[in-house]
Curated annotation (Swiss-Prot):
SMART domains: HOX (SM00389). Residues 8-67 bind DNA. Gene3D superfamilies: Homeodomain-like. GO terms for biological process: anterior/posterior pattern specification. One of its GO terms (molecular function) is RNA polymerase II cis-regulatory region sequence-specific DNA binding. InterPro entries: Antp_homeobox (IPR050296), HD (IPR001356), HD_metazoa (IPR020479), Homeobox_CS (IPR017970), Homeodomain-like_sf (IPR009057). It is found in: Nucleus. It comes from the Eukaryota. It comes from Apis mellifera (Honeybee). Its main location: nucleus. This is Homeobox protein H90. One of its GO terms (cellular component) is nucleus.
Length: 74
């Protein structure tokens, strides 16, 4: 019956200003990361690879929306 117990949802990750600044800086140079670079950033910022991957996915979507708005396409 353990399969009936719902799994707890992960809490929302909050990033420090330093982490956000470093991630934004990296995004400015590269919108896509290699696995090696993702590992390096994760170690440097004390985050998991998964957190870095998801942050970049979310940031690319934000960038895409901002560019669509700037060019006037929906």
């Amino acid at each position: 019956l353990s399969h009936c117990v719902p799994e707890r949802k992960r809490g929302r990750q909050t990033y420090t200003r330093y982490q956000t600044l470093e991630l934004e800086k990296e995004f400015h140079y590269n919108r896509y990361l290699t696995r090696r670079r993702r590992i390096e950033i994760a170690h440097a910022l004390c985050l998991t690879e998964r957190q870095i991957k998801i942050w970049f996915q979310n940031r690319r979507m934000k960038w895409k929306k901002e560019n669509a708005r700037a060019t006037g396409t929906p």
